Amino acid sequence: MDVTLLKVTAILYLLASASFVVYVFLVRDSVANLSPVLLFAGFAVHTAALGVHFLQTGYPGIAQFREALSFYAWLLVAGYLLIQLKYRLAILGAIIGPLAFLMTLAAFAFGTGGGELPPGLKTYWLPVHVTLAFLGNAIFALAFGVSLMYLFQENYLKRKKMTSVMKRFPSLEALDKLNYVLLVWGFPLMTLGILTGSVWAGIHWGNYWSWDPRQISSGIAWLFYAAILHGRITAGLRGKKAALLTMVGFAVVIGYFLLGDSIFPSRHGGRFE
């Protein structure tokens, strides 16, 4: 992946993060429009970096862990920009901007050089499965950010402690509704990611389910999010409890994504023998 473009991306994400923090915590309306613009500029350069990688290697930049980190950050920013376009939720950028910057920076820690794609990954199932799975996870990350905002505001209101920062927050009802909308979008994508992964496993390994650690963790996360949605639809689950459960679900997803393969050996992560 192009090092220069990634460096520019990281710098723009950092500047956007700083701008969001100034807007939210220092209450500077003058940077209200600058923050999303900087993040969009970073997204545009990031898109170019992914495009250059594809032209140079012939495959999308999602096969190796460092590439996955970069792709995840790209999807996260794309999702936020769509939310900003529809809901004008600039304050969410104070969470998503730094997260995207840290993920892009972490990609550098694992190197930027390319490598030969393992034979088992030279298939159209790679972009289909990974894109669906990562889209679902990116939306869950956005739901995590919205849930964090909900808990932050709920805590302030409970203590009857109003500050200028609270003016940046939408109502608790609006945050709860957005959390639900994100779960409704993320869950089907996660489901399709798991299903396409199972089909791919059946084609490559001869069985659709082999109790691989990655499959088990995905199954657990799927059941957890299914339970949250079921509770929201049938049992009136909402508010603080829904926010807490959403955050726990994402902690499971991101925890295994970052640490799972190093703790539990798996045939994922490029090891497609």
Model-based region annotation:
Residues 1-273:
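Polytopic transmembrane helical bundles with strong interfacial aromatic enrichment
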